[in-house]
């Protein structure tokens, strides 16, 4: 009588709360190493967003001037060889 319910998909960028970007403050800027066949020092930052969620965001480009307390704009998009990094 009612039929099957559609599955509700999981949102990949939940911390953005549906926004295209979200502003945040860097709490820690550091480098990390990628998953197995790759080798590098990838630049990442822990960012506390205005939605009160703390996420790990990748810092794209060749150089950056980010420090603790820097204001950043975070967008969705994962880095395939860094586990847990789903924002840029």
Swiss-Prot record:
InterPro entries: NA-bd_OB-fold (IPR012340), Ribosomal_uS12 (IPR006032), Ribosomal_uS12_bac (IPR005679). GO terms for molecular function: rRNA binding; structural constituent of ribosome; tRNA binding. Keywords: Methylation, Ribonucleoprotein, Ribosomal protein, RNA-binding, rRNA-binding, tRNA-binding. The modification 3-methylthioaspartic acid is found at residue 81. PANTHER family: 30S RIBOSOMAL PROTEIN S12 FAMILY MEMBER. With S4 and S5 plays an important role in translational accuracy. Residues 1-24 are annotated as: Disordered. Transmembrane segments: none annotated. The keyword ATP-binding does not apply. Belongs to the universal ribosomal protein uS12 family. It comes from Mycobacterium szulgai. Part of the 30S ribosomal subunit. Contacts proteins S8 and S17. May interact with IF1 in the 30S initiation complex. GO terms for biological process: translation. The gene is rpsL. This is Small ribosomal subunit protein uS12.
């Amino acid at each position: 009588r009612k039929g099957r319910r559609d599955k509700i998909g999981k949102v990949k960028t939940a911390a953005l709360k549906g926004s295209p970007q979200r502003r945040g403050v860097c709490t820690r800027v550091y480098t990390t190493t990628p998953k197995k066949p790759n080798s590098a020092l990838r630049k990442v930052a822990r960012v506390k967003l205005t939605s009160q969620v703390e996420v790990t965001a990748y810092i794209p480009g060749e150089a950056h001037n980010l420090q603790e307390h820097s204001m950043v704009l975070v967008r969705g998009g994962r880095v395939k060889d860094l586990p847990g990094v789903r924002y840029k």
